[in-house]
Amino acid sequence: MRGQIVIFGILASLCAGATAAELEVSVTDRRGEPVGDAVVTIVLHNAAANGSRNPPTRSAPSLHVVDQKALAFTPYVEVFRPGDQVAYRNSDRTRHHVYSFSPIKPFEFVLAPGVTSAPMRLERSGVIAVGCNIHDGMINYLYISDAPWAARTDERGVVVFRDLPAGAFDVRVWQPRLPPKRPDLVQSGITLRADERRSLGFALSLLPDSRLQFDREHTRY
C-alpha cells in the first residue's frame, strides 16, 4: 500500500487545462532504513509572499477511529485536518485510561473493554501526544494540519501524492522520533511541471522508539 493519503482539498482551477503531476516522497533513517508513520505535508511555495493562496481545505469533516489492541494504539500516527473528529475504541480485554496533556486539546477517557469513546473534535493545528495512564508503553500521535495535502508514510517509508497542480511547493516531514520541539524538516521550492512524476527523499536522525523506551516528557507536545 502506498500510504494512506489525506488530501485536504485541491483547487480545481489550478489543475484546469493541465495534466496533474505526481510526487513520491520516501523517508529513511540515517542508515537508509525505511521510516513509516512520518507525516508529509505540502503547501504552495511562498504563497503568502506572492499574494497567492493555498487551495482551500475540504468542507466536510471526517471521523477517525483509533483502536487499542494488544496494548498498542492503531494507528500509531493519524493525520487530521482542523474540524475532524477522533474516537478511541478499546478492543483489549483490559481497561485503558486514554489521556493527553497537550495544550492543543487536553482530554481523558476511561474505557472499559469493548467500549468506544464519544467523538472528540480537533479544532487546532498541531501535534497531540496521547498515552494510556495504565500502560505506559502505549503512545499515539494526532497530527492536525491545515496544509492542502498531507499523508503519512507506509511501512516502506513511502507516500505518493497524485493530482498535484504544476507549480512550486514546500514539502515538510515530521515523525514522532524526531527530537521534540523542533521544526519539521523541509525542502523548499520543489518545482513540478504538468504531467511530471518526481521522487523526493528525506533522511531523518531519529531518537529511540518511545513505545519501547517510554519517556513521559517526550509526549508533552
Segments predicted by a language model, with ranges:
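Bacterial N-terminal signal peptides that target proteins for export
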Residues: 1-7
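N-terminal signal peptide c-region/cleavage motif recognized by signal peptidases
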Residues: 15-17
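Extracytoplasmic copper-binding redox domains, predominantly the cupredoxin/blue-copper superfamily
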Residues: 20-221
